[in-house]
Amino acid sequence: MIQLYQSMQSVCSGKVRLVLEEKGAEYEEIDINLQKGEQFDPEYKKLNPKAVVPTIIHNGKVIRESTLMINYLDQVFPNPPLTPDAPYLKFRMGLFPKMMDEEVHPAVNLITYAVATRHIRAANYTSEELEDHFA
């Protein structure tokens, strides 16, 4: 069974939950309270050094980065397939997560950081870690 470390407030967690549901995969949700800074717990940071959600554990392997998780889950659970067979359609499909990862998510992350979690992050990161996180 998959363990999904996630937060209901996380867009990235939501897209992984959506794929797990679509695939009919059995999974256990482990909620990480971002407002309380639970992502900075040393045990969680062993799984995800960037202290972000989601993270999955499948067959003892740690998988991070939500878009890569989706690709992984589509291969591990082939039915129903999420990726079309036709190369051009596969290309078109790839444009959406690329836009989300490169444009939308950084903007949302900046706002979320500024409004909701900067006090937690500032208390739990060194200045070098903050620079690396937002690089």
Per-region residue spans from a language model:
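GST-like domain detector, emphasizing the conserved glutathione-binding G-site
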Residues: 1-134
